[in-house]
Curated annotation (Swiss-Prot):
It is found in: Virion; Host nucleus. Interacts with TRX1 and major capisd protein/MCP. Structural component of the T=16 icosahedral capsid. The capsid is composed of pentamers and hexamers of major capsid protein/MCP, which are linked together by heterotrimers called triplexes. These triplexes are formed by a single molecule of triplex protein 1/TRX1 and two copies of triplex protein 2/TRX2. Additionally, TRX1 is required for efficient transport of TRX2 to the nucleus, which is the site of capsid assembly. This is Triplex capsid protein 2. InterPro entries: Herpes_capsid_2. One of its GO terms (molecular function) is structural molecule activity. It comes from Human herpesvirus 7 (strain JI) (HHV-7). Belongs to the herpesviridae TRX2 protein family.
Length: 293
């Protein structure tokens, strides 16, 4: 196994060692892969000490190297870097119970912990949240929606709907999402979303109506009929059946642009799956997982 050794700058107390032992099997991100690191390279404290913005922390987390805490030996931690396809015991550091087959992602620690994990002078151990990928995506969608709704309105106008968006229930657990800070980073995400939406809205209807009409000749499904009804209400820049052989390249370019814009939106909301749950302990504190990437 590819072991990484983390040495603490000061001598740990027995209480500190006991706390770390309880975190065995936790996923801990580090900035880069080195065999010897100090405790300041461990976890997300360095990131959170410079920014509290969810989007920015999420982007930095994506670039970090994942390790798994294997053992505590005195003043030293032994971590391993997981390998694709291998199976590991993983500590559930998220708010939700896990089930077999869950795909798991990592998100910034947006929930206020009931207690701090380990606090030393000028440093604190802060871990990401291990969350099912579909829920992680829903969280990102809601955060983006909150940003878009609040960018041109006073908070009082959207307070009720934002409170609803911030409250998320999953598997009988209810969590509260953080407030969104509309700074340069989140504004960039909103610009990306708006540009993508506008290009899809401009290009998609013209090309889609042609395909819907052709498909409806073969399949009279209710979904296709509804699509036709929706498209019939729109005004098109040209007749949908007027594409000529010489315009195939233009049509193809529109299709590719629409798919590119869809991918742009996905990049704002989709999360990478790191683990797939193969089994879960009775108390749901540990999960046997296969490392995906």
């Amino acid at each position: 196994m590819d072991s990484i050794y983390c040495t603490f700058d000061q001598k740990l107390t027995l209480s500190d060692i006991g706390t770390l032992c309880k975190l065995t099997n936790a996923v801990i991100p580090i900035p880069s892969h080195r065999h010897l690191i100090g405790n300041t390279n461990l976890g997300l404290y360095t990131v959170l000490s410079t920014t509290t913005d969810y989007i920015q922390i999420r982007d930095i987390l994506k670039t970090m190297v994942l390790t798994i805490l294997q053992k505590v030996e005195g003043n030293q931690l032994i971590l391993i870097r997981p390998k694709i396809g291998h199976q590991y015991e993983i500590k559930n550091t998220g708010p939700f119970p896990l089930e077999k087959g869950d795909q798991l992602s990592l998100l910034p620690p947006f929930l206020k912990p009931s207690q701090q994990l380990l606090v030393l002078p000028n440093w604190e151990l802060i871990l990401p949240l291990l969350i099912p990928t579909d829920v992680a995506t829903e969280i990102n969608v809601r955060m983006l929606c909150i940003s878009l709704l609040s960018i041109h309105r006073k908070y009082e106008e959207v307070q009720i709907i934002i409170d609803e968006l911030r409250t998320l229930q999953y598997r009988d657990v209810t969590i509260k999402l953080p407030d969104v800070i509309n700074d340069c980073k989140s504004t960039f995400s909103m610009k990306t979303a708006c540009i993508s939406f506008s290009m899809i809205a401009t290009m998609a209807p013209d090309i889609v109506q042609t395909y819907i009409e052709r498909l409806s000749l073969e399949d009279q499904s209710m979904l296709l009929i509804k699509c036709q009804e929706l498209l019939a209400k729109k005004n098109f820049s040209q007749e949908p059946s007027s594409f000529k052989a010489t315009e195939i390249k233009t049509e193809l370019q529109k299709i590719k642009t629409v798919f590119t814009m869809i991918n742009q939106i996905n990049s704002l909301t989709q999360e990478k799956t790191f683990f797939i749950v193969a089994d879960v302990s009775a108390d749901n504190r540990l999960a046997t997982c296969i490392f995906k990437e």
